[in-house]
């Protein structure tokens, strides 16, 4: 007896990303490689012009702290994209995600072309940022 995706009880959360790469509707949401939900909708936020992704999380996983974060990953080198859920800390006072919540901490997809460009030409911005980070760390 295979239960269809639409029959599974779930709650919806959403998140915005700078770049979703090739992420598609029905792409899996995984925690440690285990599928706990799926992308249910992708649209462009009309105010920010950033991709807004709606995710249906299976109801059985209803104890996910709101301190959790999302990152878009790729299965293998050229495989399908999915969203990895990094479960946040829970100190007993942190609220759990519920229907309609927004996950704020997101990391965009690494686009293969960008990675190749960084490898071939170097990324001057990263080097500048590293120097600034080191200066900031030394001053504290």
Regions found by a protein language model. Give the residues of each.
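Extracytoplasmic/periplasmic terminal helices and flexible tails
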Residues: 1-10, 14, 24-25, 73, ...
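Short alpha-helix capping/helix-loop boundary micro-motifs
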Residues: 13-17, 55-58
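Short beta-strand/strand-turn micro-motif
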Residues: 18-54, 65, 72, 80
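Short, surface-exposed acidic/glycine-rich loop or hinge patches that mediate macromolecular interfaces
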Residues: 20, 58-60, 106, 110
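Solvent-exposed, non-transmembrane amphipathic alpha-helical segments
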Residues: 33, 40, 49, 56-59, ...
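Surface-exposed connector loops and short turns at secondary-structure junctions
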Residues: 59-67
